[in-house]
């Protein structure tokens, strides 16, 4: 295994206030027009802080842009939950839709439906795959091809005892900046098996505004550079201060206070195909573990339960989880990841 460090474009915020979004120029096909519409209707003229696609996708202006640019996917595809015999394809559609993914070789098919319950995202599961095998795939939405000229593929994980070489890329601190999004193409050229998103994957800094959080995810996920990388690369994500709360924030030991913590967690879950998210509804968070062959990865959450007075980053439940997982691990290599 080789670890490839990718330094993503970051904007370090000196205060708790979010900086204005860097706009994509209006003359950039699709993205300029679409971003401006989203900003006006989800952010500047939106009083509902929990707003998402369901609040705008029936508006004539939105429908006109979707039709004009032939948009079938409003995010994705992103590869996730890769095992030796399975994987999921995460994606978002502009409205409720039937989605089908077909992987080759083997004509392996998965189907799912998107709905407003998860902000029109879903995970299409592909089962019965072979270990350490390259698969190409197609996506249709309501029976129509959805990927245009994109021809994505992914590789399944090796079996535990299978000795293989693979690359993992990792990074964080990635404010959406239209002129810098080319970084994703540079990462893609290294053909990593997976990418570890180590927090500050977006600079949101407004934990009370789910509408802003969703808007920022849309902006990143609609970038063609990001799509080219993540449609063929397994994603593993945790957050840090700027995509969880605000600069240098500490969530505290109470799982449900401040009251914004769980809603932020729910938005995060909509947007990442992780194996699981912390301790679930009773102990929310973004920590999880996974393995690739003889390497065990432990993705930690250093914000949700951080408490400066108590001197803890993880909180007692997550710390117990981490120690137990490390003790139980039989892998030759163990990688602990933190934002």
Regions found by a protein language model. Name each.
Residues 19-339:
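Metal-dependent phosphoester/phosphodiester hydrolase catalytic core
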Residues 13-17:
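Sec/Tat signal peptide C-region and signal peptidase I cleavage site
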Residues 3-12:
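Sec-dependent N-terminal signal peptides
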């Amino acid at each position: 295994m080789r670890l490839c460090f990718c330094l993503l474009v970051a904007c370090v915020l000196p205060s708790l206030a979010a900086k204005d979004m860097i706009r994509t120029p209006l003359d950039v096909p699709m993205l300029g027009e679409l971003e401006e519409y989203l900003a006006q209707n989800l952010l500047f003229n939106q009083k509902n802080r929990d707003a998402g696609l369901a609040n705008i996708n029936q508006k004539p202006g939105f429908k006109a842009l979707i039709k004009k640019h032939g948009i079938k996917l409003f995010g994705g595809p992103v590869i996730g939950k890769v095992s030796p015999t399975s994987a999921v394809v995460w994606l978002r559609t502009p409205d409720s839709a039937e989605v089908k993914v077909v992987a080759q070789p083997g004509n392996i098919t998965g189907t799912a439906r998107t709905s407003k319950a998860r902000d029109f995202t879903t995970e299409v599961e592909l089962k019965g795959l072979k270990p350490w095998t390259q698969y190409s795939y197609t996506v249709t939405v309501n029976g129509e091809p959805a990927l245009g000229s994109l021809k994505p593929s992914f590789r399944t994980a090796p079996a535990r005892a299978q000795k293989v070489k693979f690359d993992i890329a990792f990074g964080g601190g990635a404010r959406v900046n239209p002129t810098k999004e080319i970084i994703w193409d540079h990462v893609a050229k290294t053909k990593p098996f997976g990418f570890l998103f180590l927090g500050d994957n977006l600079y949101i800094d407004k934990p009370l505004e789910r509408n802003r959080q969703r808007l920022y995810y849309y902006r990143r996920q609609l970038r063609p550079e990001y799509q080219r990388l993540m449609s063929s690369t397994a994603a593993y994500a945790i957050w840090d201060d700027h995509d969880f709360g605000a600069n240098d924030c500490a969530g505290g030991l109470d799982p449900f206070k401040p009251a914004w913590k769980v809603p932020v967690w729910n938005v995060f879950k909509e947007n990442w195909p992780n194996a699981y998210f912390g301790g679930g509804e009773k102990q929310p968070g973004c920590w999880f573990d996974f393995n690739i062959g003889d390497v065990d990865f432990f993705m930690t959450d250093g914000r949700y339960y951080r408490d400066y007075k108590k001197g803890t980053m993880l909180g007692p439940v997550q710390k117990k989880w981490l120690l137990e997982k490390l003790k139980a691990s039989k892998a030759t290599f163990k990688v602990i990841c933190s934002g």
